Design a protein with these regions (language model features):
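Sec/Tat signal peptide C-region and signal peptidase I cleavage site
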Residues: 39-45
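Surface-exposed, polar/charged faces of alpha-helical domains
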Residues: 48, 63, 67-71, 75, ...
Length: 228
């Protein structure tokens, strides 16, 4: 498992050489996976609290990491997609990340951006969380906020170094879903994405953003996005 920046380095996507460089911020990739074959996880139930959502993610993530090398990058990606979509408020995060441009998008474009955003997140996590070397993932508490609930946690790396990771949770129906991630209580994942997306939208428009997200996911997983 490698904990480091997850910023969109779209200059590595060969098919999009014109995308402007954006400032990279450190963030932590946090994800979870469903089992394939012999692996099994409990049937998903309505979460009682935001902490339950994060604990479920962490339990599944550890199981995926322990089988990471056997699954390979495409197998890890396939496992991560369903849990990412049931644990993260992908559409909400995509909307905030796109910013003011969201209001001018058609419903079809909004759906495409949300799907590509979720696919990119899953691919990045599958790439970063690829093995297990004794790491610990722990929920340490939760507290109410004006916009929902903040769940605090830490990832203890193999060398014993703790990394503080907090989750902003948003109520969606009966479930609490992750709407943002903060590294060291300061670096917002959504704010980082919004800064990066703004540069891409300015030069390449919404189609360029969708292509960049899919291109990055393709590069990380070797699985080409389906045509809409």
């Amino acid at each position: 498992m490698r904990i480091h920046t997850l910023s969109l380095d779209f200059n590595q996507v060969i098919c999009l050489p014109t995308v402007a460089k954006t400032r990279l911020w450190k963030a932590v990739a946090l994800a979870a996976g469903l089992a394939l074959g012999a692996l099994s996880y409990p049937v998903h139930a309505t979460t009682v609290s935001g902490g339950d959502t994060v604990r479920e993610l962490y339990d599944a993530l550890l199981s995926t990491m322990k089988n990471g090398r056997t699954l390979g990058k495409s197998g890890r990606f396939t496992q991560l997609v369903p849990v990412i979509h049931r644990s993260f408020d992908i559409a909400w995060m995509a909307r905030l990340s796109v910013g003011p441009s969201w209001g001018g998008l058609s419903e079809a474009q909004r759906q495409q951006v949300s799907e590509s955003f979720g696919r990119y997140i899953s691919a990045t996590y599958a790439d970063r969380f690829d093995s297990y070397d004794g790491q610990k993932l722990e929920v340490t508490g939760e507290r109410p906020t004006p916009s929902g609930v903040m769940v605090t946690s830490q990832i203890i790396k193999a060398n014993g170094e703790p990394v503080k990771v907090d989750y902003m949770m948003r109520r969606n129906g009966e479930d609490w879903l992750i709407s943002d991630i903060y590294l060291d209580s300061a670096i917002s994942e959504v704010a980082t994405r919004r800064s990066e997306f703004a540069a891409i939208l300015k030069t390449d428009g919404i189609d360029g953003l969708i292509a960049a997200l899919d291109g990055k996911a393709d590069m990380l997983t070797g699985i080409t996005a389906k045509a809409f």
